[in-house]
Curated annotation (Swiss-Prot):
Locations listed in the record: Cell membrane
Keywords, ordered alphabetically: Cell membrane, Membrane
Keyword Cell membrane recorded: yes
Organism, as annotated: Syntrophomonas wolfei subsp. wolfei (strain DSM 2245B / Goettingen)
PANTHER family cross-referenced by the UniProt entry: MEMBRANE PROTEIN INSERTION EFFICIENCY FACTOR-RELATED
GO CC, one annotated term: plasma membrane
Job description of the protein: Could be involved in insertion of integral membrane proteins into the membrane.
Membrane disposition: Peripheral membrane protein
InterPro entries (UniProt xref): Membr_insert_effic_factor_YidD
SMART domains named in the record: Haemolytic (SM01234)
UniProt protein name: Putative membrane protein insertion efficiency factor
Length: 68
């Protein structure tokens, strides 16, 4: 299941390759998600991803935000 989610994220990354980057953070939200899923698994990694996506909006200054 974890690898399937990671593959879906990679498909998303390839599908949006030509779209200008809009993520306010480094690493990007999709790369953060892959790293969180690999490090913590589906439950905790998924929760970290949801929290990160909730912070990725125009009113947040963004910046460097690694997976804990």
């Amino acid at each position: 299941m974890q690898e399937m989610l990671i593959k879906l994220i990679k498909i998303y990354q390839k599908a949006t390759f030509f779209k200008p980057a809009s993520c306010r953070f480094y690493p990007s939200c999709s790369n953060y998600s892959i790293e969180a899923l690999r490090k913590y698994g589906i439950v905790k990694g998924g929760w970290l991803t949801v929290k990160r996506l909730a912070r990725c909006h125009p009113y947040n200054p963004g910046g460097y935000d690694p997976v804990p």
